[in-house]
Amino acid sequence: MRFVIVTGLSGAGKTQAIRSLEDLGYFCIDNLPPALIPKFAQVCYESESKINKIALVIDIRGGEFFDNLFESLKYLKEAGYKYEILFLDADNEVLIKRFKESRRKHPLAPNGRILNGIQMERKKLKTLYNMANNVIDTSKLATRELREKINSIYQEEGQIESKLIVTVVSFGFKYGIPVDSDLVFDVRFLPNPFYIPELKRFSGIEKPVKDYVMSFDQTKEFVNKIEQLLKFLIPNYLKEGKRQLIVSIGCTGGRHRSVTIANEIYERLKNDGETVNIDHRDIEEDINKGGKKL
């Protein structure tokens, strides 16, 4: 069992830290009242659940409940429950800038100067800072760099970092672009099987339409270019912390060309070892006469 208490100054990056730990497979709870830590630890250590990595964010947002933290930590030690503390810190000037940019009030100085709140918080957290197993100063760290530091400390040996989950969506422009799209490609420049009587009734999944759409040189070149682009983008998105990518392929009605192209891209990514899903959003819409969709 690895039991991590994440704490530190407001604005120092605890939210990003807990997200990074979650990506590493930690069961995470934000702002748990310190008085509940002993009972929670007991349940985790003594249960037969498969949860073996826990991360709790504990900070001064708990108000007067925060004062129970040291008593709870003492209980953990006496009970033999191992824990470690990760403390997030940053320079006063950086914290002030972050608060001003986010337009948030400091929890210890809601009606006063941000600096006063930071100074009060430092004093309140001094003992916890000295107890910390790991201290990360985020003053000069970008989000990606903080995640890399978290990974270097808490990623288990041999653990593979989370992969990017790619979802390829085919759609029809007449029903609207999927609102969660990251990348949108328009394949209406390709010859349309809809206007060929013997192909109209088939979808892009079926062989007659697929063979027709893929028979053109521009189709093959387009798919090759999309595959090359995604091979370049996926590792770079991962470096920046992105975990999901929605690639939307659109034609007029979402039944023929976009379906064939989406399937082709899906198969290529799968063969490349990517984690990939496929969704033909509008494949039945011309039949069902649906309206605009999300």
UniProtKB/Swiss-Prot annotation:
This protein's UniProt keywords: ATP-binding, GTP-binding, Nucleotide-binding
Q: Where does GTP bind?
A: D59, I60, R61, G62
UniProt-recorded Gene Ontology molecular function terms: ATP binding; GTP binding
Gene3D superfamilies documented for this protein: P-loop containing nucleotide triphosphate hydrolases
Query: Where, in this chain's numbering, is ATP bound?
Result: G8, L9, S10, G11, A12, G13, K14, T15
Superkingdom per UniProt:
Bacteria
Q: List the disulfide bonds.
A: none
Whether Magnesium counts among this entry's keywords is: no
What task does this protein carry out?
Answer: Displays ATPase and GTPase activities.
The family note in this entry says: Belongs to the RapZ-like family.
Q: Output this protein's name.
A: Nucleotide-binding protein CA_C0511
